[in-house]
């Protein structure tokens, strides 16, 4: 969609160019051009927070998720400018446990701590919310493993 819009813009610029590539003054665009430019930049509907959370919980709860899909999901989730909700992290930790991938559980918890950044109250809150899951699955936090001192 974006490629087509760029092609239309390039064709329009070429059509206005003179013999030596200099742009001639073009007539003032009418209202149809304004509507067209608005359409060129629309990107569809945005996702609500609840839909975002549900999408990621569903992704990590897939019974047939493999190690590659798990890592891909974690990598994608970490690239967003947010700290994932505890229910998303819970689903990811359970997927790690189904795959017996302890290293990914530690990586997820370290990523959450890193994403919290200077807001020191976020990481303890997430760990508090995840404590029943961590105990159930037998997962230690990076602090309990001594990895925060390295």
Swiss-Prot record:
Principal localisation: mitochondrion
Record's keyword terms, sorted: Acetylation, Heme, Iron, Membrane, Metal-binding, Mitochondrion, Mitochondrion inner membrane, Phosphoprotein, Transit peptide, Ubl conjugation
Modified residues (Phosphothreonine): 141
Modified-residue entries (N6-acetyllysine), positions: 87, 113
Molecular function via GO: metal ion binding
Function: Component of the cytochrome c oxidase, the last enzyme in the mitochondrial electron transport chain which drives oxidative phosphorylation. The respiratory chain contains 3 multisubunit complexes succinate dehydrogenase (complex II, CII), ubiquinol-cytochrome c oxidoreductase (cytochrome b-c1 complex, complex III, CIII) and cytochrome c oxidase (complex IV, CIV), that cooperate to transfer electrons derived from NADH and succinate to molecular oxygen, creating an electrochemical gradient over the inner membrane that drives transmembrane transport and the ATP synthase.
Name of the protein in question: Cytochrome c oxidase subunit 5A, mitochondrial
Species of the source: Cebuella pygmaea
Biological classification of the source: Eukaryota, Metazoa, Chordata, Craniata, Vertebrata
